[in-house]
Amino acid sequence: MLTLDTLNTMLAVSEEGMVEEMILALLASPQLVIFFEKFPRLKNAVTADLPRWREALRSRLKDAHVPPELMEEVMCYQQSQLLSTPQFIVQLPQILALLHRLHSPYAAQAKQLTESNSTFTPALHTLFLQRWRLSLVVQATTLNQQLLEEEREQLLSDVQERMTLSGQLEPTLAENDNAAGRLWDMSAGQLKRGDYQLIVKYGEFLAAQPELMQLAEQLGRSREAKSVPKKDAPMETFRTLVREPATVPEQVDGIQQSDDILRLLPPELATLGITELEYEFYRRLVEKQLLTYRLHGEAWREKVTERPVVHQDVDEQPRGPFIVCVDTSGSMGGFNEQCAKAFCLALMRVALADNRRCFIMLFSTDVVRYELSGPEGIEQAIRFLSQRFRGGTDIASCFRAIIERMQGREWFDADAVVISDFIAQRLPDDVVSKVGELQRLHQHRFHAVAMSAHGKPGIMRIFDHIWRFDTGMRSRLLRRWRR
């Protein structure tokens, strides 16, 4: 079976130009122009996808098969090229019959060339083959364009669906260009409008709770790079020029304000002997506002001091993945559930912006896992947001799942985040011991996001940092009032 790629090679038809024209026409379509104006961050993400589009189009052209009629005509043309003029004249009736049977666009022109010339010369033989080849090139080009047009319609349909999805989720999940690119990659999945509206809903809830978003950003970016003074830093010599009054008597050329007691004017010195003005004298002395004689000329000297070298080493703090455990017990239902889900969505936003992983585990009696930053992150986020918090509380299982996950090499610098009201039983000693070991030896950090002011101190004591977001009615009213 003859492929279109082989036919293009045989007839020297360049598909590259046609592919580029199709890509340019796609980018110039009104739908994309309006989308790029509305969401400029996603423009770079879509543009970065162009090489993949080109490769997909080339692959489609390469794998496409030529229709049997065109393939038969091409094979006949190739065989005819090998014939001499006398041999071609002998085969001409069969060639004309073949072109007529295949309904070739060249059939009528070939018949006209033959009938209008009584003598079939070598020049006519060459002209016949040239026009035949030109007809085949036109047919091959038309076939390429038809396939590209079909692909363009399909590609435009897919891009429009992804643009709709990405445009809806961009305000919630795309903080920067990196996040926009990852969001565009995730949008390649098969999603319906009703599915991702759940993310939009929680995004709107998150926007209405700016303190929750701020808390997520503080937690997510709490491991910033910091400068650490170099230990045992050597001393370095530091030289400065200091201006001082001349120490030898010189010609007086005026009065100035200073703290030079040796050059005090008599009226200033007299105030020192008056009890009521003594403190005023000392104040002016400290502020260098006493009236003194100004000598002609000033003396400069070089002051030499030593101080530690101020160079610092930058201790870049690793920023690894998030392992987020969410309490799905009955006490976490209602507003707590909304806040916990919205907080995870905010952490997903931070993870996409900083190119980090975000792994969610739900704990009640069983542990359910979701990865929100993978290629199927949007589907995973929708499944997570669809969960209902109606189970029991088994925080020990949560910590054991975190500990198990942190044993893997790809999670060696992960941060653990536990979202709960921490109204639960105490942790077993072996779990507390293992968490402490991970904190000491591997610098893993454990964060608690407390949704209640009544969490048990015995449980929360093991965390490196406790982020409080009280969901009680009083705190909610206070936050609303402050806005």
From Swiss-Prot:
Pfam families hit by this protein:
VWA_CoxE (PF05762)
Q: Which SMART domains match?
A: VWA
GO cellular component terms attached to this protein's record: cytosol
Which key words are in the record? Chaperone, Cytoplasm
Q: Does the keyword Magnesium apply?
A: no
Record bears the keyword Cytoplasm: yes
Q: Which PANTHER family match?
A: PROTEIN VIAA
Family assignment from sequence similarity: Belongs to the ViaA family.
| HAMAP family in UniProt | ViaA
Q: Kindly state the subunit structure of this protein.
A: Homodimer. Interacts with RavA.
Q: Sum up the protein's function in the record's words.
A: Component of the RavA-ViaA chaperone complex, which may act on the membrane to optimize the function of some of the respiratory chains. ViaA stimulates the ATPase activity of RavA.
Q: What is this protein called?
A: Regulatory protein ViaA
Q: Which gene encodes it?
A: viaA
